[in-house]
């Protein structure tokens, strides 16, 4: 949540060098999709971001009609895939750090900060600024008002995003296989929440816990750091190939 596509650029370049056609993108209001003015003018929520991800998927399908379509998503990007309007075209999902963001499924040491953010800091900042200035505050990233408030509702519900009407059926009806990778040292999500999100999909194939090597922290976002190129990146490529075999 709140991570620009530029963060994933080194991994995407490496993946392309292995012969994979890759498209990365920014949701509206984020990164290269952020307008020059204030985020106050961006009327986008997470349902809007579902449509953005779907548009990216369809664009890739139009550009390369003969290739199988895979989604490699990190955190929220993986969570949204099961609800895409064009999900029937997806050949498989490789999910990194995909878990329930419900406050009760977060790491115990992280819960009090999440509670403060969801109950006080987030709503107050949005009311004052018209968007969430996360970069200024050192908390996630800058987010459109609607995205922050919808995410807040999800995180305060035991069913997380599945609390939205009809999403249970959508995710259970998604036929694509899911491979989910969870880092044992994830500082945010508990493994239980990651497994719950995994089995919420209709075709959960493989759940794997990544154990960091000595001194090589992984965490919630760290799989994509260049230090993991020799070890973890080839494993991700292997799983992508598994999804189309």
Q: Positions of the model-derived regions?
A:
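Short alpha-helix in the alpha/beta-hydrolase fold that links the catalytic acid
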Residues: 190-200
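Catalytic active-site module of serine/aspartate enzymes centered on a nucleophile-bearing elbow/loop
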Residues: 208-245
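Conserved alpha/beta-hydrolase "nucleophile elbow" surrounding the catalytic nucleophile
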Residues: 1, 70-75, 183
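Short beta-strand/loop motif that positions the catalytic acidic residue
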Residues: 174, 180-182, 186
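Alpha/beta-hydrolase active-site loop
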Residues: 42-62
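Conserved alpha/beta-hydrolase
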Residues: 5-37
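Active-site nucleophile elbow and catalytic-triad environment of alpha/beta-hydrolase enzymes
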Residues: 154-171, 176
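Alpha/beta-hydrolase-fold enzymes
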Residues: 72-157
